[in-house]
Amino acid sequence: MKPRAARAALLVIGFAAARALGAQTAVTTLTITGGSTATFANPTQADYVAGYIDGPTITFTVSTANGGSQPRTTTVEICAGTATLGSGKAISKLLWQPTDNSLPYQSIVTGCTGAVDPARTVGTQTIARGSSWSGGVRLRMMLDWADSAPSYGTTIQMAVSVSP
């Protein structure tokens, strides 16, 4: 092969590789950065008098990569993995609030499937490729004097939706 033909072949391969890199699929990642295995403390008499106990804070980061220069709107949602907390305690007794106080405490709902639901939306941000945003969720358990089970529990799920 002549040197000129070899250079032309390498140049074509270089353009093909550059084009493939430019057409990469957008990747959005939701990373739980804290509180993923936290539990509530045992309630005290003062907690029962107050009617609730504050629980752990879950923190997260949403990041984007690849997929061109178009900004992406990302929405983070929180939900419970079970319909009850066990021992007869309703899931509605578990409350959540974004750490930025953009919403009041509200009851957690079951399941993160389907369309984005305002009842489980922690936050929404439009971010450019290669950018990220962080947030958090505070948990609170409503108490009453009739609560006598030694423990309650559910799996907390978080999901990220991306558009366009």
Q: Each predicted region: which residue ranges?
A:
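Bacterial N-terminal signal peptides that target proteins for export
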Residues: 1-10
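Leucine-biased recognition of intrinsically disordered, low-complexity hydrophobic segments
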Residues: 10-11, 21
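N-terminal signal peptide c-region/cleavage motif recognized by signal peptidases
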Residues: 17-18
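N-terminal small/polar-rich segments of proteins
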Residues: 21-101, 118-164
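Extended, solvent-exposed segments with strong compositional bias
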Residues: 114-116
